[in-house]
């Protein structure tokens, strides 16, 4: 498919041919959902922890004798039914991440790219460069009508990354970092010429 190449000044810089096998497939919502869940699971810290019966402080002595008191038998004051007792089946420190096949991850990324193209929210940029001043980049983004955009380049230029850092909902990623969650989490997906070539190599 042919796409018009735009500049950050909202000008035209020719056309680019985007491969249909990356930007023209039928989006798979189920695959994208699987990849997003996988990404979010990997991001979880997993530092949640409560103390169990064997970890809370307190005596290990039997509260009272087994029989003859008229009360229900008890073996420990650290049992979960007591106010100061341990938790039962509570959360423990663990890794929430799990494995997802590379082919599924690849198809998820291709589906996300194709969905943006199908929605008309894919923009091909000539280059993503800036002076480093946020105000200048903010004016250009406003002129383009972008309120939420992800800019993907082969490598994010240092000045451009610095200028975009303070803009809300405007993010820049290298092609190696392009992912389903961030693509779907932004309204516009802008990819530079170099970024397109990088995605071709990555998804070849």
From Swiss-Prot:
GO terms for molecular function: rRNA binding; structural constituent of ribosome. InterPro entries: Ribosomal_uL4, Ribosomal_uL4-like, Ribosomal_uL4_dom_sf. Disulfide bonds: none annotated. Keywords: Ribonucleoprotein, Ribosomal protein, RNA-binding, rRNA-binding. One of its GO terms (biological process) is translation. The keyword Cytoplasm does not apply. SUPFAM superfamilies: Ribosomal protein L4 (SSF52166). Gene3D superfamilies: 3.40.1370.10. GO terms for cellular component: ribonucleoprotein complex; ribosome. Residues 49-90 are annotated as: Disordered. The keyword Ion transport does not apply. Belongs to the universal ribosomal protein uL4 family. Part of the 50S ribosomal subunit. One of the primary rRNA binding proteins, this protein initially binds near the 5'-end of the 23S rRNA. It is important during the early stages of 50S assembly. It makes multiple contacts with different domains of the 23S rRNA in the assembled 50S subunit and ribosome. Forms part of the polypeptide exit tunnel. This is Large ribosomal subunit protein uL4. It comes from Gluconacetobacter diazotrophicus (strain ATCC 49037 / DSM 5601 / CCUG 37298 / CIP 103539 / LMG 7603 / PAl5).
């Amino acid at each position: 498919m042919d796409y018009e190449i735009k500049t950050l000044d909202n000008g035209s810089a020719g056309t680019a041919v985007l491969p249909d096998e990356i930007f023209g497939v039928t989006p798979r919502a189920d695959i994208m959902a699987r990849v997003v869940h996988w990404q979010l699971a990997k991001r979880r810290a997993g530092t949640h922890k409560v103390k169990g019966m064997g970890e809370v402080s307190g005596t290990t002595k039997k509260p009272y004798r087994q029989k003859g008191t008229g009360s229900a038998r008890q073996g420990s004051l650290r049992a979960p039914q007591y106010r100061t007792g341990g938790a039962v089946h509570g959360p423990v420190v663990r890794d929430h991440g799990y494995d997802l096949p590379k082919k599924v991850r690849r198809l998820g990324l291709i589906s996300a790219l194709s969905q943006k193209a199908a929605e008309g929210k894919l923009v091909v940029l000539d280059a993503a460069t800036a002076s480093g001043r946020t105000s200048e980049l903010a004016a250009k983004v406003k002129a383009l009508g972008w309120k939420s955009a992800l800019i993907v380049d082969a490598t994010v230029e240092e000045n451009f990354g610095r200028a975009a850092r303070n803009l809300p909902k405007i993010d820049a990623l290298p092609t190696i970092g392009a992912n389903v969650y961030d693509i779907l989490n932004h309204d516009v997906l802008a990819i530079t010429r170099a970024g397109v070539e990088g995605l071709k190599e990555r998804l070849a």
